[in-house]
Amino acid sequence: MKEFQVYLELDRSLQHDFLYPLIFREYIYALAYDHGLNSSILVENLGYDNKSSLLIVKRLITRMYQQNHLILSANDSNKNQFWGYNKNLYSQIISEGFAVSVEIPFSLQLISSLEEAEIVKSYNLRSIHSIFPFFEEKFPYLNYVSDVRIPYPIHLEILVQTLRYWVKDASSFHLLRLFLYEYCNWNSLITPKKWISTFSKSNPRLFLFLYNFYVCEYESILIFLRNKSSYLRLTSSGVLFERIYFYAKIEHRVEVFDKDFPSTLWFFKDPFIHYVRYQGKSILSSRNTPFFMNKWKYYLIHLWQCHFYVWSQPGKIHINQLSEHSFYFLGYFSNVRLNPSVVRSQMLENSFIIENVMKKLDTTIPIIPLIRSLAKAKFCNVLGHPISKPVWADSSDFDIIDRFLRICRNLSHYYNGSSNKKSLYRIKYILRLSCIKTLARKHKSTVRVFLKRLGSKFLEEFFTEEEEILSLILPRASFTLQRLYRGRIWYLDIFYFHH
């Protein structure tokens, strides 16, 4: 390790350019074990002490440079041994260590950017539900919406080259190429999805980092052009596509792109366009005509094709009118509903009738997909009729009731923002009867007999959760105000969403 000591003692501002020595540090793998791998399983499986683990990792990296087949393909056996050790497991160790190392400079950049902008960290902004108040505020004034699914996979060589622009460490990315070589069709411009699936399952941390970096790079270009388009002008659409291709070939991309772009497309000038993304799905909405939305649509397609070499079909990006079509996002169907109202006004002896139309965001629960999910989990059949869950029949009564109540509360917690609660009540009804049938099956009784023995208090537990939350939030509020809040509530403590 003495030969790497000179790199590790560099100035803190320059250390992000030398990530390769971090791969040989013991604590990096300790972090990887905490986040991903189980250290107890490693010790049992590998049979080595922690003092010799670093030596084995160094040997594996050296062997990788000599032979490009340390990482096994999907058809190879997981039991093959390399110096008496599991190949796939060690490749996972190194990939986890690399992922932890390469995340360090981006974390430092994020912290410094927050400090420079004096942005106060708020956990409420991390909530998935925080996007829906934004929809309620902005979308009633917009006209068109487009569902955009970010295409993947991109050519991994393009991804590595882009990553090298942000982290200037050639040695680390030579190692990254060796990892990716066995998981993709290197001679093809479009990586087969089956290789991506294999890579994401065996190296989840590294895969998530690479995917998030790809999305970040795509959005940085999108935001840059969006900010430039508010005051610049151009008359030819062909220049944009040439600039994108030119932009991909320039070493100092952002600086050159900024200087060499004295004018941006005037027909992108749209101060009322909004962009929202969660994972691989994004929403693009505007208040202008479909002409502007189509320009953005074809711009995105050419951006993916010319810069990331990803093929995307224009027919898969649909532009719909918000007042006539719903868009599906984060488990809700949302659209802008027209709410007409009539007001009678009287001035002296004359009376007037004023008709007014208010636009309001309407969010509904996708009842059919939810019933399909419940049917797949054996809570009901495909028609939505509740059935017993025999897998849980061996558990105690308390555990069975607790499991059903937990699922019911989670669904109620997430879908309490629906404009119409009938679908939510139907889901809770299915879970309630499924719980009763499971208990009746366990005790070899009928549902009617079992309900008589339990009483009506058991059923109330499935419906009183909302009222308990409201009583905590609004302890002194009037019944009318509580009823108003009962219409739609967004919670800011939901940080992830299971599909």
Curated annotation (Swiss-Prot):
One of its GO terms (molecular function) is RNA binding. The keyword Plastid applies. Belongs to the intron maturase 2 family. MatK subfamily. One of its GO terms (biological process) is RNA splicing. Its main location: plastid. Keywords: Chloroplast, mRNA processing, Plastid, RNA-binding, tRNA processing. It comes from Gleditsia triacanthos (Common honey-locust). Pfam families: Intron_maturas2 (PF01348), MatK_N (PF01824). Usually encoded in the trnK tRNA gene intron. Probably assists in splicing its own and other chloroplast group II introns. The keyword Cell division does not apply. It comes from the Eukaryota. GO terms for cellular component: chloroplast. The gene is matK. It is found in: Plastid, Chloroplast. This is Maturase K.
